[in-house]
Amino acid sequence: MAKTSYALLLLDILLTFNVAKAIELRFVPDPPTLNITEKTIKINASDTLQITCRGRQILEWSTPHNRTSSETRLTISDCSGDGLFCSTLTLSKAVANETGEYRCFYKSLPKEDGKTSVAVYVFIQDYRTPFVRIAQDYDVVFIREGEQVVIPCLVSVEDLNVTLYTKYPVKELSTDGKEVIWDSRRGFILPSRVVSYAGVVYCQTTIRNETFQSSPYIVAVVGYKIYDLTLSPQHERLTVGERLILNCTAHTELNVGIDFQWTFPHEKRSVNGSMSTSRYKTSSNKKKLWNSLELSNTLTVENVTLNDTGEYICTASSGQMQKIAQASLIVYEKPFIALSDQLWQTVEAKAGDAEAKILVKYYAYPEPAVRWYKNDQLIVLRDEYRMKFYRGVHLTIYGVTEKDAGNYTVVMTNKITKEEQRRTFQLVVNDLPRIFEKDVSLDRDVHMYGSSPTLTCTASGGSSPVTIKWQWMPREDCPVRFLPKSDTRMAKCDKWREMSNNTGKNPLISQTSVDERTLKTISTLKIQKAVDHALYRCIATNKMGQDQRVIVFQVTRFLNLSVLPSSSPIEGQDVIMRCVADRLLYYNLRWYRVANVANHDPPPAAVPCDTLTLSHLHQPNVTVSGLQGTNVTLDMPIPNATMMDQGLYACQVEIVGTNEKTCLLHNLRLRALEMSRIVTNLTDQRVNVSDSTTLVCEVSGTPTPTIVWTKDNQTVMEGSGVILKRSNRVLTIQRVKKEDSGLYICTACNQQGCESSEARISVDGAEEKMNVELIMPIGAVVIAMFLWLLIVFVIRNRKRPNDGDLKTGYLSIILDSDDMPMDEHCERLTYDASKWEFPRDRLKLGEPLGRGAFGQVVEATAYGIEKATTCTTVAVKMLKEGATSSEYRALMSELKILIHIGHHLNVVNLLGACTKQGGPLMVIVEYCKHGNLSSYLKSKRGEYSPYKKRTPRMPNRREVQQDEDPREGDLGLGTSTRLDICTGTAVCTRTGEQTYKTLQDEQESSDWDHLTMEDLISYSFQVAKGMEFLASRKCIHRDLAARNILLSENSVVKICDFGLARDVYKDPDYVRKGDARLPLKWMAPETIFDRVYTTQSDVWSFGVLLWEIFSLGASPYPGVCIDESFCRRLKEGTRMRAPDYATPEIYQTMLDCWLDRPLDRPTFTQLVEHLGNLLQASAQQDGKDYIPLTNGEMEEELVAPHLNVTSKRSFYAGNTEAQLHYDNAPPLGFPQQMNSSGVPVNMTGFVDIPLEHTTVMDGHVDCGVGLSREQMKALDRQAQRPLNFSPLLRCKSKESLASESSNQTSGYQSGYHSDDAEAPIYANEEMILKRDIRKKPPLPKRNDKFSAEVRYSAPPV
């Protein structure tokens, strides 16, 4: 019976297959056609729909009538005739729910649209029922993750604006045409993830202000797949009493529930994943990943016994799918460790093997701690090391070499019992013998006759010892006359002889030695006298095999053959073949053509002539020369050489005395003439103004073609900005200008002809045009002033600080790390090479400016780094040799930070960088010629005057009229100032007056010879301005001090910190605290105690910087020991007294910066406004105004390189000495115990304790150091302190009134108010500055002798 059923089943399968093939091969008729040609038609509700279908076979219809009871209204009638099948569908009184697809198809064939069926989509329009209702109240839409979903809310009216809504939660999903797509025939099509969270969705439309909703659709996300099931650990070992923890984890689809079942070895039964007994506990956990679920069940068995040993099985079931995972457990009675009994084992390997394994047979629980030793030296594994631990114990050595041989010892220690076991393995590395000289020696050794050379063979075979023996062969026994070049030729020379001292013509001595340390065998063969040619062979042998080296020993006298004019002459040249020999050894030189040897390249150097077939040459022009001296020369000229002259030539010489003939061979090869040809044609280029472009014209030809470039039929010559390289093959145009546009032609010519290629260069963008007509006048002025400039330069250098004090650098700041870590900040910052990259070949390094632990800063000259100049002095920061990758990344991060900060006048700005491979990383910043502010102030101590000195000159009528001209602005200033940001040079010019350079030099010569109070306030104001900019860029400096402020030309100060250029271990300003060195004198209390760096801690440092400025570079806290007591007193409220040259307003500003609470300190914006008012007042007393730059002005002028700001160095015209008038100028003294809020405070100053052993170092007084001589004199001169500038001035100009108004309404005031502010103005109160005011004024004399103490009445909160 079973056999019959099987046969019937097989027969049925065969019939089905044949029928299917018959259907495939059967003729398919033409598709049916409808009387309606449109794909979509529209009718109104209650209308009658009639569709006629014609075809070649029996027809049937499919309709959406199942949504309604349309049996009585839907009829299908046969209309066949004329040989075609015909069927008519009639639907009367159509309703909206019958909207859909009406398809006509062949009854006996599968439905294929356009082949066996045809359809039309009918909209039955009913504006009262715009949505096609489903039969039930709701429908379920099943979705799967990652698939498209169709929400089938069909409409009866095609052109409706339909919106999809989710109900839980309520949300509108608008149609965007990309993810959410509306199709009036299908509904909404969208990804499943868009509605996977929604419980219910529905469609909605509005018709004539009436809203209609479709039936609701329930969204059901289904899933059942279990991707994987893991049980960890798979192999567990424990001792009695320990705890077993097994974690069964399944990764599934979303919305999948898992039932976990556990099977134990000793119970042989399954328990569910939620059971809990005294020893067995399970816990479940669920974790949703981004596209799956992670379901886990953890089994915990307390106090395992020996009976718990066995297999544990975890079964996970989702209903439709099930997976099983298992793990094994071995329970031991107690910890142990056991190694194999063999104490010494030998492991052999071969050099060059991929790996060598030293396997350790052991059995232990728990896993022991393993240490490996090689020759009693501990092996430390590293990632890049070739040794690895396999499974934590076995040692694997990759890429075996001879150096790996040795004794390896493994030491295993039980982590619980501390029991220790060790075994030693000897690794022997065998290798085939290798003769080292074969790697570097030539095929032949040529020695002078009578010399005593030594032949050496050095061989090694790894751990296998090597023996070396020598053999020799006379040249008569080698049938190959030419010197051997390959092993195939050497195979013919097999008559080797053993060595003996009395055989052959070359007496010799043999010696062999072994180097025990390197396992190398060295054998030498000493030739006592080189007499005749011979072959020598050394053979190295060990148990792995052998190696040999053949030395072709050639004895020669002076012979040489050369070809002129070059070793590779060209067809058509006049060639000379020259043979040179020692005339004391050779004579009768003759040239021959060799006939029996062809195409031997290269030929041997010298062979016996009797082995060659020589043909005589007609030599009428052969000349013998050089008979004087020891050499004789035979020249054979070949005029106008042709290809027929190619071949092997021999110069025959005869040896004096023996008449033996030796031939020197040379294979003459000529290079055929070839017409010039351009290999790659030029292509048109479009470049931007100031970019560089390169045209490459690769040519070939013999002789080498000459290349000429032309532009618009004019020859291109190399010059400024135009570079020709590689014999004119490469044309480079630097800093392209508009006039560089044109047609460039490369023409290559030689004797055979010429060829050219052309390309058109188009230049886009506008360029900065320089008035060429001004070049000649400016050049004449510069030349005429050269001597005067040289004098000024010498004077400046005399008063410049030492080179050791020049610490020029860049900004070493940090980003505010509240948002993310510093490393992540730097990773996110980008470097735009197209904007900042500067070629290294246009950078000329000069003298070093600073040097630190791992970096250095050098002065350099950059060519073309700025548009307006061709040569700029810059500072370049670079790493020292041997810098690590982390130091490279640190410098690269600081480069990115500088780019992120941007440009500002009072910050050392970035100019470019060199980051490309092929050279060191270099960061290019501005160069500040006057060095750091601290050193500069110290150098100017003897040249300080609180007031401005003026050189009187007679004003002319035109100048007076210009000064009074009201058209020159509200400020009444007839000068305009331009400040070049990059070069730091400023110029004040009047229309029709002096030129840029003249005014600049006059200005510097008159104003830079001494310091004034206005200078000090200006420095402070500019630093505050720069810090305000840094604060706006969320940057914290952390080391704001005078040493990190650089002074450029025209009194422009720039904030910097050459971190790598300063070695903090050698700087006395940095005090060791733990493992770090910190500038404690400049640090705020919260930074010292809590390591908190904020912008307000920079404000504290700014206050200390003010103290440095107004003490002319003195070290803060003079005479105070910087230790824990200093930090404690600082926290208790003790502050420094006013410096010698500070006004009350300035000192009060310092105290405000030193307030205990960071939030009570002024911001840099407030400090800018306050110091700007003080600077304005000081400038007005000097007869002019100083207008601080605003942020808007700064940003605008950073685009254009000239800043429209009134320079603090302006000219004063008068017929008498400069007179300064003061209104209500109070005497300089301490503030009247007022803080920034006007609240009286009691502050303690640091008490100076003079000690016996004092040392003064550059004005710096540290622990155990007393006051300097200047400071002692200052105490006696305090009473003679000069009057101060008052910030509340009564000025007669309206700009002065504006300044006063600004001063009164400032958002931040110093807290000082003069008691004489309302006193009457004394017109006769004035001070005339004398010419001899260059000497330092007397320091103020204080009555309190530094004993006055001020303390806070209550500590700040």
Curated annotation (Swiss-Prot):
The keyword Protein biosynthesis does not apply. Residues 23-774 are extracellular. Residues 1-22 form the signal peptide. First expressed in embryos between 5- and 7-somites in the bilateral stripes that contain the developing angioblasts, and then localized to the intermediate cell mass (ICM) and the developing vasculature. By 30 hpf, expressed in the major trunk, head and intersomitic vessels, persisting through 4 dpf when expression is seen in developing subintestinal veins and in the remaining vasculature. It is found in: Cell membrane; Cytoplasm; Nucleus; Cytoplasmic vesicle. Keywords: Angiogenesis, ATP-binding, Cell junction, Cell membrane, Cytoplasm, Cytoplasmic vesicle, Developmental protein, Differentiation, Disulfide bond, Endoplasmic reticulum, Endosome, Glycoprotein, Immunoglobulin domain, Kinase, Membrane, Nucleotide-binding, Nucleus, Phosphoprotein, Receptor, Repeat, Signal, Transferase, Transmembrane, Transmembrane helix, Tyrosine-protein kinase. PANTHER family: TYROSINE-PROTEIN KINASE RECEPTOR, VASCULAR ENDOTHELIAL GROWTH FACTOR RECEPTOR 2. This is Vascular endothelial growth factor receptor 2.
